[in-house]
Amino acid sequence: MIDAPFIEIEDLHFSRGDHEIFRGINMTIPRGKVTAIMGPSGTGKTTLLKLIGGQLTPERGRIVIDGQDVHRLSRKALFTLRKRMGMLFQSGALFSDLDVFENVAFPLRVHTDLPDTMVRDLVLLKLQAVGLRGAR
């Protein structure tokens, strides 16, 4: 049995004024995989992520995440769905008033009930894994 994709984009159309950004885009993103949206500046990467996250509304087409049509969800249901997603945009990804350790710890503190000692251990483990051991 083949698993259903986590994200399905069907016949997506989106423009800003007279500038057509997407025309009939179809795409599937598998469950449990890290997926990168890459391309030169101005090709619509951030716009696509905002459409997927429900921050923008397409002119036509559907974006379905885990069986839910993003643009037909209530505000509350959309916020619930967003809690299960992670998006990293090309800028503004770090809190400039927090050090490296606290930037890594932040989502663990906000989205889990882990004790501080476990958050500390996980952050140190992750920093070491990417060669930032001792970073503050």
Predicted regions and their residues:
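The feature captures the beta-strand-to-loop junction immediately N-terminal to the Walker
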Residues: M38-P40
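Helix-to-loop junction immediately C-terminal to a conserved catalytic motif
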Residues: G53
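Conserved ABC transporter NBD signature motif
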Residues: G61-D69
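Conserved ABC ATPase "signature" region
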Residues: Q68-D69, T112, D116-A135
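ABC ATPase NBD coupling module
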Residues: V70-G86, V110, D116
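ABC ATPase nucleotide-binding domain signature
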Residues: R84-M85, F89-A93, L98
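Short coil-to-helix segment of the ABC ATPase nucleotide-binding domain corresponding to the Q-loop/switch region
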Residues: D97-F106
